[in-house]
Amino acid sequence: SPLTVVALPDFLIDHFPLKSTAEFVRLDGLTCDRRDLSQLQAVTEWLSVHLGDGETAYMITDDMLYNPGHLRNCLLPEQPLDGKLPDSFSVPGTHNFPMSFFEAKYVLTADPFPLSYASPTELGHRLNAKFLELRDSTHQQVATFDMGNGTVFTIWERTAPVTREEVETYLHE
């Protein structure tokens, strides 16, 4: 795959569980062979039309199959989401607390979540779970996109101003 280069000696390959190896190969194939490119472009175009000057969106999902970079770059050479779709939050010590999540006009979620190997305790999972729990009091659903591979993206628009209590709820998750 152009996105994932793995060179392992044969003795290591024999020690990988076949089920996890098969799942990696499946996800890697989906990443390389973008049969959902038109759907990615549709999500990007929807956001481009609905985000005004100074407005942003936040994508909770951040893995090898779907991440903000895929949406920012799916219409190359045009990049209509540059400056409008920041990187997501998932790696402690590397990514800062996602203030851009609270500043975003729109939040993108994916179902099913997760889409790759990240554990349920990974920060993106925890942010997604808390968002799903609280979304009805802060956001409303405005669009969905079937990616054609079992994944559905939902776009949620913020309907209530951010409160200190909301930020602290996510911070202490």
Task: Give the residues covered by each predicted segment.
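Extracytoplasmic
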Residues: 53, 58-104, 115-132
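Short, acidic Gly/Pro/Ser/Thr-rich loop/turn segments
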Residues: 1-2, 163
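Membrane-proximal, lumen/periplasm-facing interface regions of secretory-pathway glyco-
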Residues: 2-49, 61-69
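Aromatic/acidic, Gly/Pro-rich catalytic loop(s) in extracytoplasmic/lumenal soluble domains
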Residues: 102-173
